[in-house]
Regions:
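Short, Lys/Arg-enriched N-terminal segments with co-localized hydrophobic residues
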Residues: 1-11
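Generic structural signal for short, solvent-exposed loop/turn connectors between secondary structure elements
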Residues: 11-12, 140
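Generic N-terminal amphipathic, Lys/Arg-enriched alpha-helix
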Residues: 12-20
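Short beta-strand-centered segments at strand-helix junctions
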Residues: 17, 24-64, 71-116, 121-148, ...
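Amphipathic terminal alpha-helices
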Residues: 157-159
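Short coil-to-beta-strand transition motifs
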Residues: 161-163
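Short beta-strand-to-coil "C-cap" segments at the C-terminal boundary of structured domains/repeats
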Residues: 199-201
Length: 201
């Protein structure tokens, strides 16, 4: 706003939990049956912060043209296979790093998924997840933001504070409030586990 012919910028800040999301994948029931055998199901190892989401005991080796990475499956089953890795890990696998929202998989690289009982080749589904914020409709109103809005998030207080831009807001009654960064982003800010950050408007 303007006051006495001077431009005054008002920056709104809201504190929110920040989590590091390491590499993982989501699979369909059909893919899981091929990888682990008919009749097998996902084993809940640990509940995650997002309601209904859990890390599984079962792991899959993701194979690219240049290398491979073994990672955990996150449950429950999804309608489509999706592999989420960091930009650094795209180089290890030898695939193009494509930054996308979860579920936006058209035109993304594929890979081979290898389990103890078989393997599946997918022609798309490997993404570097766009950094994002999960909010309920109530917290979105409280923070003054809306679904698909792009905001900034400030994290780190150990001499490596970083302000991340291009953070997309995702609003759903199924969510719990949290910012998700990948391991490259968390390492850049020197984050150690779950911490607090500030949404900057």
């Amino acid at each position: 706003m303007y006051t006495n012919n001077r431009l005054v910028v008002i920056i709104m800040k809201s504190t929110i939990m920040v989590e590091t999301s390491a590499h993982h994948l989501h699979v369909t029931a059909e893919t899981f049956a091929t990888l682990y055998g008919e009749g097998k199901t996902l084993t809940n190892k640990k509940d995650l912060s997002q309601p209904g989401q859990f890390a599984c005991t079962e792991k899959v080796t993701v194979v690219g043209p240049r290398g491979e990475i073994t990672m955990s499956i996150l449950g429950p089953f999804r309608p489509e296979d999706q592999v989420e890795i960091s930009m650094t890990e795209t180089r290890k696998l030898g695939v193009t790093g494509v930054i996308r929202e979860s579920g936006d998989l058209a035109g993304t690289p594929g890979c081979i998924l290898r389990g103890p009982e078989g393997e599946v080749e997918i022609d798309h589904g490997v993404i570097v997840a766009q950094r994002h914020i999960h909010l309920t409709p109530e917290t979105a109103v409280e923070y003054g933001v809306e679904d698909k809005q792009i905001v900034k998030v400030a994290v780190g207080d150990n001499g490596r504070k970083v302000i991340f831009d291009d953070v997309i807001v995702r609003v759903s009654p199924k969510y719990a409030p949290a910012v998700h960064l990948d391991t490259d982003e968390a390492n850049a800010a020197g984050l150690m586990g779950t911490t607090d950050g500030e949404i900057i408007l």
